[in-house]
Regions:
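Bacterial N-terminal signal peptides
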Residues: 7-18
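Positively charged n-region of N-terminal signal peptides that target proteins for export
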Residues: 1-7
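Short S/T/G/P-rich N-terminal loop/turn motif that feeds into the first structured element of a domain
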Residues: 20-102, 106-212, 216-234
């Protein structure tokens, strides 16, 4: 858990430099193993209250639990959302000047837990935040053809929406992704209001027509390195 506040060595992908902008939807995400989900949720709510009262610029901070994929049940996440990178770095300085925010919240829970960090972004408006139970299916991918991926992602969104999927389909690009994420340089995700909507969307995605389209237009341009499903706790 001490790694939660340490600076991690990161790599910048050349692909990212071409498509990540100074004004963006930014997600600063911590992947934590060995943490009780309820304790983390409570600590996150307490930290948010202190940080917002202290002038933090983050749009929101939430915690979630991994339901499917590698190490489900033992893996939790803290996601912090910003409108741009400047706000993120401003909050980093603010948190450093107010160490009690961390010490009195996250610092009181399991210090033996391990964590990794990745910062991801895109240049689109930030989607509206959901409530507890919001469900996200994701795949970390190594993009092998940036042009083809960028051309086909909007079409993929249209294909899923036309099929009636009640999910937001989008992607985020690595701004700083460490060894735990690399060689992936992006994440494709489905975001649903609840597990029911996600299940129905996954059924649509698994249909023969959608799979044929994906294998013809998306799969040739990516290598999937990890995938999973998570649900938000707050």
């Amino acid at each position: 858990m001490n790694n939660f506040i340490k600076t991690l060595l990161v790599s910048l992908s050349l692909f990212v430099l071409t498509i990540t902008y100074s004004k963006a939807w930014v997600m600063d995400v911590w992947t934590i193993e060995g943490m009780d989900a309820q304790e983390l949720s409570d600590a996150t709510a307490a930290y948010k209250e202190k940080a917002m009262a202290g002038g933090a610029k983050m749009v929101n901070i939430r915690s979630s639990s991994k339901l499917r994929g590698d190490k489900p049940g033992d893996t939790t996440f803290v996601q912090v959302y910003y409108n741009n990178f400047s706000d993120m770095m401003s909050d980093q300085m603010l948190a450093a000047a107010n160490p009690d925010w961390f010490a009195s919240t996250y610092g009181k829970i399991n210090q033996d837990a391990s964590s990794n960090n990745a910062i991801m972004a895109n240049d689109k408006p930030m989607p509206e935040g959901g409530a507890a139970g919001q469900t996200v299916a994701y795949a970390f991918v190594e993009i092998t053809s940036g042009i083809n991926f960028l051309l086909n992602m909007p079409k993929f969104q249209e294909v899923m929406q036309s099929a009636g999927a009640k999910v937001q389909v989008d992607s985020l690009n690595c701004a700083t992704c460490g060894e735990s994420v690399l060689p992936a340089n992006a994440m494709i995700y489905f975001a649903a209001a609840n597990m029911k909507d996600m299940g129905e969307a996954m059924d649509i995605f698994a249909s023969s027509d959608i799979q044929r389209w994906v294998f013809a237009n998306i799969a040739p341009h990516i290598n999937i390195t990890d995938a999973g499903v998570l649900a938000f706790n707050n």
